[in-house]
Amino acid sequence: MLKVLVTICIAFIYLPNTSSAQFFEQGQFIKDIENRVLWLRCSVGQVWSPETKTCAGKIVKLNQEEIKVAIIQAGEQLPGAWRLPTLSELESLVCSSCTPAKVKNKYFPGIAREAYWSGTRNSFNRNMFWSVNFQTGHKYSRFMAYQQLPFLLVQDY
């Protein structure tokens, strides 16, 4: 009995980290089981190429008001209710061991090495929103709503 228990304990030590199974590819979408969201795997402005397995096109940078219009347009072109990711959801994409861009390129190719909008406002200054910089992997709340940054879209599932 003790031998079986020791074997089970050792097996759990060597199980792969569950965070490595966070993402599942679904064509132009990434299913994120940790956050229970579906990501558009390319930055807004880019399109997914299944042949090259990469994002093509120019990344669009918008301010928070312009993003509201882009979200409406995304809803007209793709099924579901799209939105900006929360700070927590966006931070979950950071791969600290990756070289810049600090994101798992397999799932999110073409991410710019710069700050991306989240939909989370700064609670101390409601004119500012949190962002995640994929050059460094750090979060910041130093951008005003009128500034233009790239962004990703998600929907709940």
Label each residue range with its predicted role.
Residues 12, 45, 58, 98-101:
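General secretory precursor processing signal
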Residues 4-13:
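Sec-dependent N-terminal signal peptides
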Residues 117, 142-157:
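Short, structured beta-strand segments at or near domain termini in extracellular proteins/domains
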